[in-house]
């Protein structure tokens, strides 16, 4: 979890804030939880600016952008789109449509749209599409490497149009990412049939009575944002062995307990680095890489060490693909490996170093990146370092 790229990417993130408490539509609930994408991008070493801080700037000269599009032959003036005229006589513009007002169209169909899109209405007014691409073009001209738009399902369709329009301006899909967040799908356990059944959407206030905010966030993020996220309200976040969030939190709490017991018994000595607060991504990355210096006595320990060392790469991939589910699944793998290892670890320096690394990694990723709470512990300080191991 270091600054993973040699060159820091400058990113503009547009994720309209939606207050969960006033959102009355289930599709917006999951969307409202995607604000953690900013954490994800920053922890992977990017410089992130929210679109709201840029949207108040004066819109540049739309006419100038419009003329640039025309000079690049990405637009044309006609009565109908190319998709319609293909089935008409070649001279239809000079004959049937000769007295019709001509309209400017952008060649978005060349980039995956199902038809070309209008840029200017017959009365001369510019369309919202042209206004939008002008604004985003302006942001790129200010030195941004990437623009990421995250929107609820109501924007389905416009994502294809806008992405294609930006490609007409020469920007790739990697530079301009438009992500539609799919909704949650609720399920509940039906006792009479002993089966899981889908249930109708319920209001956010009612949902939060059944599922904690932490569980709601976890199950919203552990599935790709572009896929519907199933959530079983009967078990989500409940203290059961089947719940993945509970297992992860249990692994963290077990790490805390073992470290605290070892310190109280004088087996190990830990000290705070000072300064408090979060550890920097660079510091954690260095600690994780140091695990490669040890020889592990058990397969579980070796697997856990490898999983922890892979965190910087997973974090980088998760940020690049706007895929927090990759981070969630990696955390699940860490917890699944940790739990059996924690029950059988022997008292030696490398195991306690691994224990501390696992605890700190879970803390930083779950709480500081994914904004999901952890169980209370009397040993919560994440800013610790291993000082001494006593063999007495």
Residue ranges and their predicted role:
Residues 1-392:
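Non-catalytic interaction-recognition regions
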């Amino acid at each position: 979890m270091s600054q993973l790229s040699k060159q820091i990417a400058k990113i503009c993130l547009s994720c309209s804030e939606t207050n969960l408490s006033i959102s009355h539509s289930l599709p917006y609930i999951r969307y409202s939880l995607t604000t953690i994408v900013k954490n994800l991008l920053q922890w992977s070493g990017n410089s992130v600016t929210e679109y709201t801080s840029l949207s108040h700037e004066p819109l540049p000269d739309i006419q100038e952008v419009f003329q640039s599009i025309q000079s690049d032959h990405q637009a044309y003036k006609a009565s109908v789109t190319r998709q319609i005229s293909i089935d008409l006589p070649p001279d239809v513009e000079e004959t049937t449509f000769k007295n019709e007002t001509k309209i400017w169209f952008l060649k978005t169909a060349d980039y995956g749209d199902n038809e070309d899109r209008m840029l200017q209405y017959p009365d001369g007014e510019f369309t919202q599409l042209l206004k939008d691409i002008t604004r985003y073009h302006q942001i790129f001209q200010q030195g941004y490497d990437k623009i990421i738009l995250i929107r609820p399902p109501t924007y389905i369709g416009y994502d294809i149009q806008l992405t294609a329009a930006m490609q007409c301006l020469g920007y790739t899909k990697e530079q301009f990412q438009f992500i539609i967040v799919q909704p949650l799908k609720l399920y509940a356990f039906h006792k009479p049939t002993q089966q899981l059944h889908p249930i109708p959407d319920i209001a956010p206030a009612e949902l939060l009575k059944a599922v904690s905010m932490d569980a709601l966030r976890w199950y919203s993020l552990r599935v790709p944002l572009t896929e519907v996220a199933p959530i079983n309200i009967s078990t989500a976040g409940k203290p059961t062995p089947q719940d993945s969030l509970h297992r992860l939190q249990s692994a963290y709490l077990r790490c805390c307990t073992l470290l605290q017991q070892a310190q109280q018994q004088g087996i190990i000595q830990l000290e705070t680095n000072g300064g408090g607060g979060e550890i920097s991504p660079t510091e954690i990355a260095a600690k994780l890489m140091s695990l490669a210096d040890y020889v592990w006595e058990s397969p579980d320990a070796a697997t856990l060490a490898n999983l922890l060392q892979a965190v910087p790469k997973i974090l980088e991939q998760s940020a690049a693909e706007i895929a927090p589910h990759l981070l969630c699944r990696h955390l699940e793998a860490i917890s699944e490996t940790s739990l059996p290892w924690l029950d059988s670890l022997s008292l030696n320096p490398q195991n306690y170093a691994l224990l501390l690394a696992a605890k700190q990694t879970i803390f930083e990723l779950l709480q500081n990146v994914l904004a999901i709470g952890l169980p209370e512990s009397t040993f919560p300080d994440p800013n610790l370092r291993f000082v001494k191991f006593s063999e007495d």
